[in-house]
Swiss-Prot record:
Protein name, UniProt field: Phosphopantetheine adenylyltransferase
Native source species: Rhodopseudomonas palustris (strain TIE-1)
Site (Transition state stabilizer): 18
An individual GO BP term: coenzyme A biosynthetic process
Cofactor or coenzyme needed: Mg(2+)
Length: 169
């Protein structure tokens, strides 16, 4: 039986923090599926297609180098439903600090009640990526700041292009 893990998030954009989680997650499973949540009430900076492409280009080679199968999907329902759909028994969540832990523990408890076969695995962020959030990256990029220390090079380029084309709403 292969160990399938789901790593959910908005990935708007992919950050070095997300990449750190993936580098650790691929050691824990036979297949990692990154699931991009689609929330009707939110207007992401990058389209779903752009985020899928980013996730595949940035995370795919990391999984391949580790000998881990990789997949990417989207979902617009409960995260546990997305996990069940891909056959995942592991839910990967990254933690930056105690605030993340408190929130993620609540979610993990609810998920465990709804889907007892899916186990949440918390991966603490490496020291160098703990302060990074996608929200802060978007804000810095929107103000013309250099985000190259916080995101993979191709994501920094995509952010620069996105904001050079005119400030997204």
């Amino acid at each position: 039986m292969s160990r399938i893990a789901l790593y959910p998030g908005s990935f708007d954009p992919v950050t070095n923090g997300h990449l750190d989680v993936v580098r650790h997650a691929v050691a824990l499973c036979d297949k990692l599926v990154v699931a991009i949540g689609i929330h009707p009430g939110k207007k992401p900076l990058f389209t779903t297609e752009e985020r899928l492409a980013m996730v595949e280009r940035v995370f795919g080679p990391v999984a391949k180098a580790a000998g881990c199968d990789f997949g990417c999907t989207t979902y617009d329902n409960l995260t546990v439903t997305a996990a069940e759909k891909v056959g995942a028994t592991i839910m990967i969540r990254g933690l930056r600090d105690g605030t993340d832990l408190d929130y993620e523990m609540q979610i993990a408890g609810m998920n465990e009640t709804m889907a007892p076969a899916i186990h949440t695995v918390f991966l603490p962020a490496s020291v160098g990526v703990r302060p990074i959030t996608a929200t802060l990256v978007r804000q810095i990029a929107a103000m013309g700041g250099d985000v190259s220390a916080f995101v993979p090079a191709e994501v920094a380029s995509a952010l620069k292009s996105k904001f050079a084309a005119g400030s997204p709403a």
